[in-house]
Amino acid sequence: MREKELKHIENLLLLKVKKEKIEETDKIKEYLKRFEDERRFDGIKESTIKSDLDRLRVFLDYCINYLGKNPEELKTSDFVKFFNYLDTVRKVSKSSQRKYFLLLKVFYRVLRMYNVIQEFVEESKDRKRFARIEIQHYDAVDAEMLNMILKKIIESGSRTRIRDALIIRLLWDTGCRVSEVLNLKYKDCDLDNGIFKIRNTKTHEERTVVCSSDTLELLRNYVQFNVRQGSDDYLFQNSQGGRVRKEWISEVFRKAVNELKEEGKIPKNRRIVIHSIRHGRAVDLLNKGVPIDIVKEYLGHKSMNTTLIYAHSKERAESLEFIKKLLRIQ
């Protein structure tokens, strides 16, 4: 496969993540440079420094460009405002807010002005604001992490790398369980509109899901090379035209995650498995304002509202169209 074709496939597979543009002024650059020099002298890993600088830019942008203050001029109330900004404007998760909190403690300590943040730190400790969040059975995958995993799979030497990356991208778009995507057959798929019928579900309830236009373009190209193309044949096939094994795609995902952990791009204490995509998709939809009852129906959770299951077809179509619009603007 030519490099240009591979790049086009990568561009289609990777999620379009919108990030608020930060105006990096000379003053912001000065603080970043001071922090970077100190951390490098401390022998901190480059990958850690990079992720810290990314978060620090957000903080410096807020206090310098929004509040009009230098970091050493902040009051306790300003730190409260910043974390409210992370929560309500940037939609930063609670676990990520804790990372910002830990970073700011380091920032003020290494720049020798810890007294500025000390009151906020003590107050936060007393009020258990950033107490360690209980680790769930699996951690969720977000769009940024998913892109790293997809790129790792695409760049591998595997003969099935495009198929495997496409399966994982469809898992994100649809929020499906792995078995639900691998069980898809041609008769379940509307490849003109990117609509899929999920029939053999854990809850024994049929549901309809959708995919993005980028995923659909790749699917249309991929199915041309399937060994078998009858209505009862699987959408994703192995070299003999049979169903792709769940163990295979789980191992592909696990290998990519482990490599990223070794590179320091994913924290080693994160419990990331292929089912983490489903958890992450649920969080992503809720963060984007999709009503919780629609998310329950879309993902096929056992606790989904029964009134939505039997809702009028028009209401169900509107729900799907709403999710399709979100996929198009990612």
Curated annotation (Swiss-Prot):
Keywords: DNA integration, DNA recombination, DNA-binding, Viral genome integration, Virus entry into host cell. PROSITE patterns: CB, TYR_RECOMBINASE. GO terms for biological process: chromosome segregation; DNA recombination; establishment of integrated proviral latency; symbiont entry into host cell; viral genome integration into host DNA. Gene3D superfamilies: 1.10.150.130, Intergrase catalytic core (1.10.443.10). It comes from the Archaea. Belongs to the 'phage' integrase family. GO terms for molecular function: DNA binding; site-specific recombinase activity. Residues 22-112 form the Core-binding (CB) domain. InterPro entries: CB, DNA_brk_join_enz, Integrase-like_cat_sf, Integrase_catalytic, Integrase_recombinase_N, Integrase_SAM-like_N, Tyrosine_recombinase_XerCD. This is Probable integrase/recombinase protein MJ0367. The active site is at residues 177, 202, 275, 278, 301, 310. The keyword Ribonucleoprotein does not apply. Disulfide bonds: none annotated. Residues 136-325 form the Tyr recombinase domain. The keyword DNA-binding applies. Pfam families: Phage_int_SAM_4, Phage_integrase.
